[in-house]
Amino acid sequence: MADLVNEFSWSRSRDKLFQDCRRKYFYHYYGAWGGWEADAPEEARALYVLKQLSSRQQWAGKVVHEGVEWVLRALFEGRDLPEAWLVDETVRRMRREWKASNERQYWTTPKSGGLFEHEYKIPVKPQDWQQLRDHVVRCLRNFYRLPLLSDIRKTPRERWVMIEEIRSFDFDGTPVYGAPDFAYWTEGDRLALVDWKTGAPDPDSTALQLGCYALYAREVLRVDPGRVELLEVNLREGAVQSHPWDEGRLEEIRGHLQLSIRSMRAYLQDPAANLALMDNFEKTEDLRICRWCNFRSVCRPDL
């Protein structure tokens, strides 16, 4: 098997991390590279373990997304996962993962990931963990009650778009990862691109994310913005919001990507080889970001 190559690419999460802190960006995409190998240098291994950490809110979102994916995958295969089974299995999974994280097992099996709160010994009351579980259960129950799910159930499987087959597309020579969570063709012959949300609304972030979905539809699926329905699904509230899009707004997204990619490449020692040197990536001066950074113990251990 050929060695993995650290290829430069763009995604919304990469863009956000770059804006938050250049040093954090370096640790995540360059310093941690290869840290999964058994014989990785100690520093790369530590950075890789820290990179895999999630806050408890991020963990909850991931659990919900994967639960929804289970349901949709089963439907595609002609099966129906009962709501009660999914809720029970998800809660059991959360207990297993919480226990493994609390025991810091992620330091020996880093790909499994751990919780930021456990690594940095952040006090969390038992009732707060229970509220997190209740939040996940609420999101899953709301998913089952969405009229949107009824529409998806009625849609012939050949009109589902298999997103996992094409996760990225080329944008001016850079791979861009911006695929939606789910997509299907509606009865009105419009392409519905779905984004599952579990947290508080963030209009700016959502606009960029949905714009990337519209760009994905144009570049990968060859569908014009006018035929696309961008659906933001708030599972916490059980609400669906449709966002209109047009060619003008798509141009704004292209402009954002071009500027972001140029800025990231400007920090590289050798852009063609995607070679980065840590000293070229400054630390943020906003200590509020530092306190909740996965790499705090390496970068600002005094906090």
Label the model's feature ranges.
Residues G67-V161:
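A non-catalytic, helix-rich entry segment at domain boundaries
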Residues R145, D172, S205, E219-L303:
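Metal-dependent nuclease catalytic regions and adjoining charged, substrate-binding loops involved
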Residues F8, R12-L17, L50-Q58, K62, ...:
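Short, charged/polar micro-motifs that form catalytic or ligand-binding hotspots
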Residues D15-D39, D170-A183, Q258-S263:
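An acidic intrinsically disordered interaction segment
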Residues D3-S9, H28-K51, E119, D189-V194, ...:
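Short amphipathic alpha-helical segments and their helix-coil junctions
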Residues W36-A40, R157-R218, A272:
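Non-catalytic protein-protein interaction segments used by genome-maintenance enzymes to assemble
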Residues G31, W196-A200, N234, E247:
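A short beta-strand motif that forms part of the nucleic acid-binding face
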Residues D15-G31, A40-F76, V87, V91, ...:
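Nuclease catalytic cores
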